[in-house]
Amino acid sequence: DANGSEQGKVRPVVVIQNNRGNKYSPTTIVACLSSKVYSKHHLPTHYLLPEGLGLKYKSMVMCEQIRVLDKSRLIKKITKLDKRHMMHIDRRIKISLDLKQQHLHSRK
């Protein structure tokens, strides 16, 4: 169930979890998409995907709307985004989560 500004209903998502996690975990991490690109406030956490990527409409990746989903909830693969799009999305995820280089540390 969605409350307030949370995204509800069946919608496309971008899988943002790394490939190793996707291979071994029963869950995956996703960012929600919205086709209401003109009604959305353009936040620094938003990335506009152009038409022609297998989506019906231009869509906004909302990197502040990150979810963990059981893989069984994924209906079908629509497309694979190239590295350029994923770099833009990665940058916005870092903004959303306030991940700065000085905050990242290795664990033993």
Language model: regions and residue ranges:
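Compact nucleic-acid interaction/catalytic patches
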Residues: 3-10, 15-51
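C-terminal terminal-subdomain/extension
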Residues: 52-108
